[in-house]
Curated annotation (Swiss-Prot):
It comes from Psychromonas ingrahamii (strain DSM 17664 / CCUG 51855 / 37). Pathway: Purine metabolism; AMP biosynthesis via salvage pathway; AMP from adenine: step 1/1. Its EC number is 2.4.2.7. This is Adenine phosphoribosyltransferase. One of its GO terms (biological process) is purine ribonucleoside salvage. It catalyses: AMP + diphosphate = 5-phospho-alpha-D-ribose 1-diphosphate + adenine. It is found in: Cytoplasm.
Length: 181
């Protein structure tokens, strides 16, 4: 059996209008991960891109970054570091505050999870406004890691999240782009 193409993977992602609020077109990756062949092909595409880049740690953002980051880390022989919301990690953490549409939040990683000069790949399911990625990159930098790239399964270019990554001098890669919102 042939692995699904990138277009077939994209077609597995359901678009849900007016979720979570009216006017939003939600791109639902759960429909992708429910399809074993498409999910496996997605991970394999990421593995092919990163397998020879000497990555020490893959950092995945809560919660959907875990879905793609952990199997990628295992496949390339890297450690996996979860980025979590406040109060979810048991050891001492470092955190970064970031802006939401209505207020602020913070992201945390264990303070000893990333060593100085470790090569780090940031992984998340979606690049939209870039706020979560920006905060995660700042956490990695504060921990001494070198972000070699940020990888996303989906990018929404209209929301200009890539601009925040460019401002931090971090290259990024996205498998699938959904134009518009």
């Amino acid at each position: 059996m042939t692995a699904p193409t990138l277009e077939e993977i994209k077609n597995c992602i359901k678009s849900i209008p007016d979720y979570p609020i009216p006017g939003i077109m939600f791109r639902d990756i759960t429909s992708l991960i429910e399809n074993g062949a498409a999910f496996s092909a997605t991970i394999n595409l990421l593995v092919e891109r990163y397998k020879d880049q000497n990555i020490s740690k893959v950092v995945g953002t809560e919660a959907r970054g875990f879905i793609f980051g952990a199997p990628l880390a295992a496949a390339i022989g890297a450690g996996f570091v979860p980025v979590r919301k406040p109060g979810k990690l048991p050891r001492t953490t470092v955190h970064e505050n970031y802006e939401l549409e209505y207020g602020t939040d913070s992201l945390h990683i264990h303070s000893d999870a990333i060593k100085k000069n470790e090569r780090v790949l940031l992984v998340d399911d979606l690049l939209a406004t870039g706020g979560t990625a920006e905060a995660s990159i700042k956490l990695i930098h504060r921990s001494g890691g070198i972000v070699i790239e940020s990888a996303f399964v989906i990018e929404l270019p209209a929301l200009k999240g890539a601009q925040k990554l460019h401002a931090l001098n971090v290259p990024y890669f996205s498998l699938i782009k959904f134009e518009g919102e």
